[in-house]
């Protein structure tokens, strides 16, 4: 089913993914790094693709990030993205860096492209070395397909504690040409970006250069991936990469292009969709939480308040317990570090107004409990009545299963 977004000239393709844009193929296989599941994959483009990336701000960064940064820095283009899961190749010293370079070299040889057109990344357990014989033999076996099956195989190959695959696809019109933006992601725990434990790979056939693509991705990341949190931990490895083949043959996109807003909106919706899927699949989670803040001093502060609320363990556990404890919400607002007038705050949980101008409303606890049990996503709305700033953030409830999953992660 296709769904039209009424606020922009954008169409959502419910069955699309990272192979939907012209020029892209994908593959995922099992090599033996994991016991049973697929653990190695690649996205490949027919042509060198303008590329942009945003990386974790964790000061301890895994070796593959350095290699990918170096590749993109040469021409601002990539043609292949190689990913393994199960082992993160983080905190592995010179050997780990050499292994990442080897992955890049073998990928270039396999796909018959220059090394600087290859990016690599890894996700999994920190502090273990990659079994390079297994990895290099696996890379040589990769045979990407320009099919939805190839996209699903790739997505499966990059998952760790995820319970579901995460795909998205949108289309828009630029110069009368159909432009497609598709993507996949992984992420379930250790999610608290400035980029954090997540990988997201987005492809598009739009004609756009590296600089303008990087500018768009950086801005959109701050509004999407950097607005999700599961557990407050920021990873060593993770990144968002966008590759643009240019095969839609539109006139080169710049912010001055008359259809720039169409492309930007499609990319924004794709990233937001993937971000929300990651939050919804938080380890042990039973539902998505969406917090919208209005009336803040500015958009940045609105986003900060929203993320503070959705990241509060007390708020998350209250949602899991179907407890409309708005006191936990206002507490998170107060320690957000943003401008707040404690006498003008409105809070609503779904349609139920719990606080008006910082005074309790005498709402029905039964109605609130029923909403929290049935709603997914659970929506929390806050109006600070300070200014015109607006922002959203996404997260999930916190359950007993989160502890169970993470207590046994390496076993």
UniProtKB/Swiss-Prot annotation:
Site entry (Cleavage), positions: 196-197
Which sites are catalytic? 197
The cellular location(s) given in this protein's UniProt record come to: Cytoplasm
Gene3D superfamilies referenced in this protein's UniProt entry, alphabetically: arginine biosynthesis bifunctional protein suprefamily (3.30.2330.10), ArgJ beta chain, C-terminal domain (3.10.20.340), L-amino peptidase D-ALA esterase/amidase (3.60.70.12)
Protease is among the record's keywords? no
Q: Fetch the CDD domains from UniProt.
A: OAT
The question of whether Methyltransferase is a record keyword is answered with no
- Its domain of life reads Bacteria
Annotated Gene Ontology MF terms? glutamate N-acetyltransferase activity; L-glutamate N-acetyltransferase activity
Under which pathway is this protein filed? Amino-acid biosynthesis; L-arginine biosynthesis; L-ornithine and N-acetyl-L-glutamate from L-glutamate and N(2)-acetyl-L-ornithine (cyclic): step 1/1; Amino-acid biosynthesis; L-arginine biosynthesis; N(2)-acetyl-L-ornithine from L-glutamate: step 1/4
Question: What keywords is this UniProt entry annotated with?
Answer: Acyltransferase, Amino-acid biosynthesis, Arginine biosynthesis, Autocatalytic cleavage, Cytoplasm, Multifunctional enzyme, Transferase
Query: By its UniProt entry, which InterPro entries does this protein fall under?
Result: Arg_biosynth_ArgJ, ArgJ-like_dom_sf, ArgJ_beta_C
Q: What class of enzyme is it?
A: transferase
Q: Which reaction does it catalyse?
A: N(2)-acetyl-L-ornithine + L-glutamate = N-acetyl-L-glutamate + L-ornithine; L-glutamate + acetyl-CoA = N-acetyl-L-glutamate + CoA + H(+)
Task: Tell me what controls its activity.
Answer: Feedback inhibition by L-ornithine.
Give residue numbers for the site Involved in the stabilization of negative charge on the oxyanion by the formation of the oxyanion hole: 123-124
- Annotated binding of substrate, by residue: 160, 186, 197, 283, 406, 411
Q: Please give the GO cellular component terms listed in this UniProt entry.
A: cytoplasm
Family that this chain belongs to: Belongs to the ArgJ family.
Q: By its UniProt entry, which HAMAP family does this protein fall under?
A: ArgJ
Describe its assembly: Heterotetramer of two alpha and two beta chains.
User: What name is this protein filed under?
Assistant: Arginine biosynthesis bifunctional protein ArgJ
- Species whose genome carries this gene: Halalkalibacterium halodurans (strain ATCC BAA-125 / DSM 18197 / FERM 7344 / JCM 9153 / C-125) (Bacillus halodurans)
């Amino acid at each position: 089913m296709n769904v039209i977004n009424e606020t922009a000239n954008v169409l959502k393709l419910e069955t699309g993914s990272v192979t939907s844009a012209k020029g892209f193929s994908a593959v995922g296989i099992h090599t033996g790094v994991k016991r049973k599941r697929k653990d190695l994959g690649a996205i490949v483009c027919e042509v060198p693709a303008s590329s942009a990336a945003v990386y974790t701000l964790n000061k301890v960064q895994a070796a593959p990030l350095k290699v990918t940064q170096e590749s993109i820095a040469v021409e601002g283009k990539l043609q292949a993205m190689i990913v393994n899961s199960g082992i993160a190749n983080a905190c592995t010293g010179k050997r780990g860096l050499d292994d990442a370079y080897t992955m890049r070299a073998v990928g270039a040889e396999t796909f018959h492209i220059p090394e600087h057109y290859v990016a690599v990344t890894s996700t999994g357990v920190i502090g273990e070395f990659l079994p390079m014989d297994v990895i290099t033999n696996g890379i040589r076996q990769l045979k990407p397909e320009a099919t939805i099956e190839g996209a699903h195989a790739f997505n499966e190959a990059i998952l760790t504690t995820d319970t579901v695959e995460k795909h998205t696809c949108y289309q828009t019109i630029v110069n009368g040409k159909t432009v497609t933006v598709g993507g996949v992601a992984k992420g379930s725990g250790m999610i608290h970006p400035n980029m954090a434990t997540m990988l997201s790979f987005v492809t598009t056939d739009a004609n756009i250069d590296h600089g303008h693509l990087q500018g768009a991705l950086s801005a959109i990341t701050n509004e999407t991936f950097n607005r999700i949190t599961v557990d407050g931990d920021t990873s060593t490895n993770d990144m968002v990469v966008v590759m643009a083949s240019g095969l839609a043959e539109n006139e080169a996109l710049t912010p001055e292009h008359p259809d720039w807003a169409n492309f930007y909106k499609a990319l924004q919706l794709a990233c937001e969709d993937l971000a929300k899927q990651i939050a919804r699949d938080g380890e042990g989670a039973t539902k998505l939480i969406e917090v919208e803040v209005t009336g803040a001093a500015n958009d940045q502060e609105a986003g900060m308040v929203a993320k503070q609320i959705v990241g509060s363990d007390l708020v998350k556990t209250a949602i899991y317990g179907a407890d409309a404890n708005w006191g936990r919400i206002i507490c998170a607002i107060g320690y957000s570090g943003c401008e707040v007038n404690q006498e003008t705050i409105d809070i609503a949980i779904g349609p139920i107004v719990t606080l008006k101008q910082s005074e309790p409303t005498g709402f029905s606890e039964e109605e609130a409990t029923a909403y929290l049990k049935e709603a997914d996503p659970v929506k929390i709305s806050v109006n600070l009545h300070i200014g015109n700033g607006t922002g959203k953030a996404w997260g999930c409830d916190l359950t007993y299963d989160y502890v169970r999953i993470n207590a046994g992660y390496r076993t």
